[in-house]
Amino acid sequence: MYELDKKDKDILAELQKNCRQSTRTLGRKLGMPATTVYQRITRMRNRGLIKGFSAILDPEKIGLPTVAMVLVKRYVRKDGKMKSEHIGQALAKLPEVQEAYLVTGEYDALIKVRGKSEKEIGKWVVDTLWNMPEVERTLTLFCFYESKESHILQLK
C-alpha cells in the first residue's frame, strides 16, 4: 500500500470533486507549484492509486433510471469444483453489471445493474443470469429511491 501524505490527499480530494481542473488551478487552490501537482498526480497514476479520469453521467437523463441489486448463489458441482472466484469473474464480464462483489452469507455474489425499467432488468435476469452455468439462483432487489450514490472516497 502506498502511504499518502497530506498534499497527496488534498490533490486527490480536489480531483474527485472535479478532475478537469488544470494543475495550475489545483496548485493555486492547494498552495503548491503546478509542477509539483503534476509530478504527484503522475506518480499516483503510475502506482495505480488513480485508475483513470471519467465523466459521471446522470443515469435518469440517459434512460437508465432503474437500479437493482441482485444476489447470486453459485452452482456447486457434486465434485465441488466451482470456486467463488469463478462466479465473480463471470459476472464481472457482463456489460450490464456496474459493480460485482463476492459476499458472505447465503448468497455468494452481489451485483448492481441499471436499466430502463424493472421489466427490462427482470428479463435480463431471466435471460442472462438464469442461463449461466455458474448460477444456481438469484434474488433481485429493486431500488425505489436512491438516498446516496457517490464515487468520492473519504481520505483520512
Describe the residue ranges of each PLM region.
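A compositional/biophysical signature of low hydrophobicity enriched in polar/charged and small residues
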Residues: M1-K156
